[in-house]
């Protein structure tokens, strides 16, 4: 039996069984009228009858104040509800950083906060975790200090949903490391200037985030014996190439296209046959040309300036512009159905878009038309050409465009690495140390989820398992080894989902790969195999009806339905 008084704080558990439903904090306003009146943290009033009093539990004093800087050490209600309330109260007080052991939790404030100045960098330099309030600079300083003291490489994993602020956190860590490494060199400037280039070609506006990273990156920052930055190397993963050809409503293509059209001179645009963003199918598909808060023309100037710092020549910049323009013109090609020897075929209508695209790619228009409307096979020295239907030709055109952009992105990353990477010294007395920053796209769940979302969410499942292992599994194993009597923490382990997706025999990835190699493999046969193999797995959700084309996966962050068609 719980005895309550006016002003007591309680947990109110009115969960309806919906996803992410947790108890909510509340304060007792009235409890002497047979019913209990409470007001929850969102300002809503509730009347609780004596029969439902079991839904109310007293709140631990540490959760009442909700200002615990380290939740592992000081939070009494160490559960999902307690953690969320602590983060909420701190967030309302503009305290966006909170520790949970060695992990820093950051809540995106969606506004500029004056907590990243040179003075803040000075305050967090050479400080142990806990000496100062939680901050991204404290994590960066801890990595740097451990690298120098222990002469061991460090790694910082930045994880979270799309729009959580991962890219900004990466930039802040880079800013801190550049400031404290002891010298403001040209190489430090080059490392920092790589960011606007990568964002231009790899980021886009989505419904959740105006500057969403559509690729993953791992930045390895190299330090010499004195602790000064002497170079870096960038690895890129899983660029979302499909965005070049199609975007969801209220989303944009990659920033660089809009920046180029707004920032180029009229003379340059004329040479490339370019007009306005609304003129191009690849840019107008999402009905979102502008992005609030972004000045595309100014961003273009920033990109060009950064490219000069990273040693891109004027010739290379112009060749990049030609490829980007060619992509836009290819997206405006018009196709017409026709029949060839009783086979469905098509032709590309001759237009300015075709002529300009061919000119920019430095090929003859007829050759380009032929490549986009037929399939050529060479077997035993014999060449066989088969016409493509209009639908097939559109897919080929889009695949061609995605290939161009994907290879261009890889080349740009390689060009940046050529400027910022310095081979390690062969002298044993001067060992190189590094701090790695992993900035990878967050968990995604859109109206339509494709294979790219599956890959992204699979990567996030691995990160979640990393955190589960280090926060829960290893800690509890250590307690068990030392025979320490303690209350085991219940947690959700996502290892079964990982096994189903990619680890166990006949996993989802292997089945998709296998079906894509069969000459007669289709989206329908692939879905049938997935259903047959995994329908009894609790982490797999098969279609309810035969005509449905989606299957679901119960990820750690929620259920996501993937479209098998396309």
Swiss-Prot record:
Q: SUPFAM superfamilies, alphabetically?
A: P-loop containing nucleoside triphosphate hydrolases
The record places domain Myosin motor at 67-566
> May I have one GO cellular component term?
microvillus
InterPro entries, per the entry: Actin_motor_Myosin (IPR051724), Kinesin_motor_dom_sf (IPR036961), Myosin_head_motor_dom-like (IPR001609), MYSc_Myo7 (IPR036106), P-loop_NTPase (IPR027417)
Pfam name, any one: Myosin_VII_N
Q: Which UniProt keywords apply?
A: Actin-binding, ATP-binding, Cytoplasm, Cytoskeleton, Hearing, Motor protein, Myosin, Nucleotide-binding, Synapse
Q: Does the keyword Nucleotide-binding apply?
A: yes
Q: Supply the Gene3D superfamilies for this chain.
A: 1.10.10.820, 1.20.58.530, Kinesin motor domain (3.40.850.10), Myosin VI head, motor domain, U50 subdomain (1.20.120.720)
Q: Does the keyword Cytoplasm apply?
A: yes
The UniProt entry, under PROSITE patterns, shows: MYOSIN_MOTOR
List the Gene Ontology MF annotations in alphabetical order: actin filament binding; ATP binding; microfilament motor activity
GO terms under biological process = actin filament organization; actin filament-based movement; mechanoreceptor differentiation; protein localization; sensory perception of sound
Q: What is the annotated localization of this protein?
A: Cytoplasm; Cytoplasm, Cell cortex; Cytoplasm, Cytoskeleton; Synapse
- Where ATP binds, per the record, is at 160-167
What does the UniProt record say this protein does? Myosins are actin-based motor molecules with ATPase activity. Unconventional myosins serve in intracellular movements. Their highly divergent tails bind to membranous compartments, which are then moved relative to actin filaments. In the retina, plays an important role in the renewal of the outer photoreceptor disks. Plays an important role in the distribution and migration of retinal pigment epithelial (RPE) melanosomes and phagosomes, and in the regulation of opsin transport in retinal photoreceptors.
Q: Which family does it belong to?
A: Belongs to the TRAFAC class myosin-kinesin ATPase superfamily. Myosin family.
Quaternary structure and partners: Might homodimerize in a two headed molecule through the formation of a coiled-coil rod. Identified in a complex with USH1C and USH1G. Interacts with MYRIP. Interacts with RPE65. Interacts with CIB2. May interact with CALM. Interacts with WHRN. Interacts with PLEKHB1 (via PH domain). Interacts with PCDH15. Interacts with TWF2. Interacts with USH1G. Interacts with MYH9. Interacts (via MyTH4-FERM domains) with cytoplasmic regions of ADGRV1 and USH2A. Interacts with PDZD7 (via MyTH4-FERM domains). Interacts with CALML4.
Name the chain's protein.
Unconventional myosin-VIIa
Source organism per entry reads: Sus scrofa
